[in-house]
Amino acid sequence: MGGGGDSRIPQYLKTLFPPETLQVVIRTYDFDPETGRRQIASWVEEVRPHLVIGESLGAIQALRIQGVPHLFVSPSLGAPALLYKAAFLASFALGRWFLHRCYPVKEGDRQELKFTCEILRKYKAHGEAAIAAIEPDGYYYAFFGRQDHYRKSGVVRIDLWERYFGKSYTEYDGTHFMETEYIESLLVPRIREVLGLEK
């Protein structure tokens, strides 16, 4: 589940795994965390996934799915608190313009980022619910890019990850949007390991 609108990683995974080996499911959910949560819960019931991969802001929604192993790419654990604080900015037209300037919609994005005060206020409870959903015996593993520009702003925080999951992560020499070489060398082998797939 991608955050924002980027679907490059799941689309690339689809090309790497034949459908008879692994079905990669890509769905677009709402930026409103409550609406998105209801959509995702319905899809989980329908698809019955064996693995959930959360990217960026999508990591927060992924954490709320229980009973399956989790992998994460650039999990944005610091985002809910920052988005909640940004709700005040979203009360003003200039503030909404600023937020869209900071997080622009790119061509091909699947998810519309709706920076309204009402929606952003929901992210505090959304983040708290995600942490509360962590299972003591669950499987959680993450990948962080050393050149991830969101680490400077506190959106992506390895210290927060370590607080809840310890050292269950790998850093790679790339950006927030995992490059294909690291998808192939790091993410794919971990997927195979978790699902018990042969090479």
Predicted features and spans:
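Short, highly selective alpha-helical patches that border small-molecule cofactor pockets
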Residues: D6-K14, A62, S153-I158
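Residue-level marker for beta-strand->alpha-helix junctions and adjacent short loops that shape enzyme
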Residues: G2-G3, A59, L77-G78
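Glycine-rich loop at the start of a catalytic domain that most often binds anionic cofactors/ligands
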Residues: A41, R64-V68
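Gly/Ala-rich beta-loop-alpha elbow adjacent to hydrolase catalytic centers
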Residues: V52-L63
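Active-site catalytic motif of lipid deacylating hydrolases and related acyltransferases
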Residues: M1-E46
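Short hydrophobic segments within beta-strands
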Residues: M1, I53, F143-G145
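The alpha/beta-hydrolase serine catalytic core
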Residues: P69-L71, P75-E198
